């Protein structure tokens, strides 16, 4: 949970946990234990690199809500706006220009509203 909070911020994680229902509990457990507990905590890649990888995958999958969340996470992990833009540009060559255009739209929204959480 520590890494999840570090990347996504306390406010987001608290809201996600507060919204758990009996229907979504299994999914939330999977996310907490597997994605954030087993994957993000591995020492082989720094969090910044993991964030940039996620941006490419979420752009390719056309998942704007998750992309928005993970652009914020990338900023929290120390990625510059230029690095994020470069990751989105890289996705244009492999995922297609329309996917990258949507990714840049999402990035612009995040950049305009991003306020680092006080740690």
Annotate each predicted stretch with a short phrase.
Residues 31-35, 52-59, 87-92:
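Short alpha-helical scaffolding segments that buttress acidic/His motifs in well-ordered protein cores
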């Amino acid at each position: 949970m520590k890494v999840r909070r570090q990347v996504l911020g306390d406010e987001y994680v608290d809201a996600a946990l507060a919204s758990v229902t009996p229907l979504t509990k299994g999914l939330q457990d999977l996310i907490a234990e597997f994605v954030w507990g087993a994957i993000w905590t591995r020492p082989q890649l720094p969090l910044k690199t993991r964030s940039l990888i996620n941006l490419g995958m979420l752009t390719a999958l056309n998942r704007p809500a998750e992309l928005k969340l993970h652009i914020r996470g990338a900023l929290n992990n120390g990625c510059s706006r230029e690095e994020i833009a470069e990751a989105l540009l890289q996705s244009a060559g492999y995922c297609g220009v329309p996917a990258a255009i949507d990714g840049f739209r999402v990035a612009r929204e995040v950049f305009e509203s991003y306020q680092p959480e006080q740690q």
